[in-house]
């Protein structure tokens, strides 16, 4: 019996499945309600990130964070016990850990 490998085929390998994408179907309001009390990243329009526990927010996107770290270009530049961010400066809010 011949144990040599089969000859190469001219067929290309099957395509890889696409990477998994977020499958959250809830509304932005549902997301924001779900991250209250959890660690979040708040990106400002200036490019500065604030990371901390989302204490509360209002309809204007005014945000209160606890145990807050300020990140500029990925480097921690300040730490605050509490931070209050005016909503018109907020570019986005993301969960710092899977929800």
Swiss-Prot record:
GO MF term (any one): RNA binding
Domain (Sm): residue spans on this chain: 27-99
Keyword list, A-Z: Cytoplasm, mRNA processing, mRNA splicing, Nucleus, Ribonucleoprotein, RNA-binding, rRNA processing, Spliceosome, tRNA processing
CDD domains membership: LSm6
A single GO BP: maturation of SSU-rRNA
Region (Disordered): 1-30
Localization annotation: Cytoplasm; Nucleus
Record-level GO cellular component terms: nucleolus; P-body; sno(s)RNA-containing ribonucleoprotein complex; spliceosomal complex; U4/U6 x U5 tri-snRNP complex; U6 snRNP
Compositionally biased residues, Pro residues: 1-21
Family: Belongs to the snRNP Sm proteins family. SmF/LSm6 subfamily.
Physiological role: Component of LSm protein complexes, which are involved in RNA processing and may function in a chaperone-like manner, facilitating the efficient association of RNA processing factors with their substrates. Component of the cytoplasmic LSM1-LSM7 complex, which is thought to be involved in mRNA degradation by activating the decapping step in the 5'-to-3' mRNA decay pathway. Component of the nuclear LSM2-LSM8 complex, which is involved in splicing of nuclear mRNAs.
Protein name: U6 snRNA-associated Sm-like protein LSm6
Organism: Laccaria bicolor (strain S238N-H82 / ATCC MYA-4686)
């Amino acid at each position: 019996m011949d144990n040599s490998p089969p000859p190469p085929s001219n067929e290309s390998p099957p395509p890889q499945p696409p990477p998994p994408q977020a499958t959250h179907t809830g509304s932005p309001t549902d997301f924001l309600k779900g991250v209250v009390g959890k660690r979040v990243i708040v990106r400002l329009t200036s490019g500065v990130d604030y990371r901390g526990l989302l204490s509360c927010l209002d309809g204007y996107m005014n945000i209160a964070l606890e145990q807050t770290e300020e990140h500029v270009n990925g480097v921690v530049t300040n730490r605050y016990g509490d931070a209050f961010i005016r909503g018109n400066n907020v570019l986005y809010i993301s969960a710092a850990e899977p929800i």
